[in-house]
């Protein structure tokens, strides 16, 4: 039978012992402030303390002291309280410092809680932004609905009803409260995001819209004016032609002032289409850095936390970015591998040998040595000195020649690291004559 309250009661007793400095055998010094704790508790709660205390496990009788300069005492107080109570006190001001200290101390539970806290704060900020933009969309939508009424009232002031100046399909659209449906106009909330228009397209749009909003000819107006006289018809036709010319001129000058509710000008696009404009969505809550994607923000937060989640499988070194790890592995570990010149396979000092032909040296594996018939190489000391790997470039490799050979041949001094050849030549007879001539006077 398991008693769930036993764990919490045990933590309370240990925390009380820590506060009263009872059986505390470990001291942690953080920027001059000393914290008392128990080895067993620190060993069980932190991977860093587990590694540190296991190295000093033989000296259990002596008290252990650990010093840290990477985080502040307030940050370590939050972590130590979590170790002894299971309660983590996170705020918007200390979450980055606590996460950085937990990453250094290798406390995965604290890191996961800090990540969840940061993600929740980002979600809240995103919801506030979405709410703000939804309210702005409603405002722009209400402005777009009211514009047809302004358009119709302007025609009423000129002396005619709006129904008399529109085609038969346009009249019911205004009465039903859904204006300009025949011209593919939708409120801002129903529109799908579109890319920003180019400058030359924006200039051509007002002219195109005058064609779509073309007013009917006088003959069409006569068709709707039932019971009116011919004189009334001619006067109204003349009035419509003048009004049509005036509207076209106004639309070319300023499409917004003419009452077009779906004009694609720069001003209206910024009011009705806030989502079309490029806006940076994610802002770091601890600095002024702003990014577009959540993955970029997650990578940026590692600058504050010091987290390095990508370890090198060869040497164990950790990196904060995956491209840094691949570059490290390619330049450090792969570049130093020895390769057989013939088969291009990786060889070692045991599976290959260095072959020297004159001043040229290269490495061959044992199989390639057997194929080329060089398996019976002399094993005396002089030849062994020439079999030097590229890593032993600091050793001095010289030709061992007798004095007679030095007189007759050119002495070659070879540098193993850079494969440089330096020739030391005796002075010729011509140079000796030049040195003697100044003395004969």
From Swiss-Prot:
UniProt entry tagged with the keyword Nucleus: yes
Residue intervals of the BTB domain: 24-92
List of residues that carry Phosphoserine: 161, 167
Subcellular location: Nucleus
One Pfam family, short name: zf-C2H2
Annotated stretches, region: Disordered: 135-248
Keyword Ubl conjugation set for record: yes
Keyword annotations: DNA-binding, Isopeptide bond, Metal-binding, Nucleus, Phosphoprotein, Repeat, Transcription, Transcription regulation, Ubl conjugation, Zinc, Zinc-finger
Coiled-coil blocks: none
UniProt biased composition (Basic and acidic residues): 198-208, 227-242
Cross-link (Glycyl lysine isopeptide (Lys-Gly) (interchain with G-Cter in SUMO2)) at residue(s): 178, 182, 199, 437
Molecular function GO labels: DNA-binding transcription factor activity, RNA polymerase II-specific; DNA-binding transcription repressor activity, RNA polymerase II-specific; RNA polymerase II cis-regulatory region sequence-specific DNA binding; RNA polymerase II-specific DNA-binding transcription factor binding; transcription cis-regulatory region binding; transcription coactivator binding; zinc ion binding
Any one of the GO CC terms: nucleus
Functional description taken from the UniProt entry: May be involved in transcriptional regulation.
Protein name (record): Zinc finger and BTB domain-containing protein 8A
Organism of this sequence: Rattus norvegicus
């Amino acid at each position: 039978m398991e008693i769930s309250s036993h764990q919490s009661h045990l933590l309370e007793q240990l925390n009380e012992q820590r506060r009263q400095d009872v059986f505390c055998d470990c001291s942690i010094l953080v920027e001059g402030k000393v914290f008392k704790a128990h080895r067993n508790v620190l060993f069980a709660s932190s991977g860093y303390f587990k590694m540190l205390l296991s190295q000093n496990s033989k000296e259990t009788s002596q008290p252990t002291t650990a010093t840290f300069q990477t985080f502040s005492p307030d940050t370590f107080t939050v972590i130590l309280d979590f170790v002894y109570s299971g309660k983590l006190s996170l705020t918007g001001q200390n979450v980055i410092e606590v996460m950085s200290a937990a990453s250094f101390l290798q406390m995965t539970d604290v890191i996961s809680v800090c990540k969840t806290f940061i993600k929740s704060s980002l979600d809240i900020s995103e919801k506030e932004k979405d709410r703000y933009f939804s309210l702005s969309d409603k405002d722009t939508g209400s402005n777009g609905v009211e514009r047809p009424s302004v358009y119709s009232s302007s025609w009423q002031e000129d002396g005619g009803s709006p129904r008399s100046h529109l085609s038969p399909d346009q009249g019911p659209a205004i009465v039903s409260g859904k204006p300009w449906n025949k011209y593919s106009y939708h409120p801002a909330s129903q529109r799908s995001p579109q890319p920003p228009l180019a400058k030359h397209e924006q200039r051509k749009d007002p002219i195109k819209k005058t064609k779509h909003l073309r007013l009917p000819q006088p003959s069409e107006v006569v068709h709707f004016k039932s019971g009116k006289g011919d004189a009334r018809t001619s006067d109204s036709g003349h009035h419509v032609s003048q009004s049509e010319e005036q509207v076209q001129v106004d639309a070319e000058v300023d499409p917004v002032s003419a009452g077009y509710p779906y004009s694609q000008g720069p001003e209206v696009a910024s009011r009705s289409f806030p989502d079309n404009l490029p806006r940076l969505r994610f802002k770091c809550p601890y600095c002024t850095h702003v990014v577009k994607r959540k993955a970029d923000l997650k990578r940026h937060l590692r600058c504050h936390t010091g987290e390095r989640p990508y370890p090198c499988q060869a040497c164990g070194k950790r990196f904060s970015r995956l491209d840094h790890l691949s570059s490290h592995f390619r330049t450090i570990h792969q570049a130093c591998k020895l390769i057989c010149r013939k088969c291009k396979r990786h060889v070692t000092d045991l599976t290959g040998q260095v072959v020297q032909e004159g001043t040229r040296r290269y490495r061959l594996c044992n199989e390639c040595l057997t194929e080329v018939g060089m398996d019976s190489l002399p094993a005396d000391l002089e030849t062994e000195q020439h079999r030097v790997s590229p890593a032993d470039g600091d050793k001095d490799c010289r030709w061992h020649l007798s004095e007679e050979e030095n007189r007759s041949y050119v002495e070659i001094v070879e540098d193993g690291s850079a494969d440089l050849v330096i020739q030391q030549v005796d002075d010729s007879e011509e140079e000796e004559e030049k040195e003697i001539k100044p003395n004969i006077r």
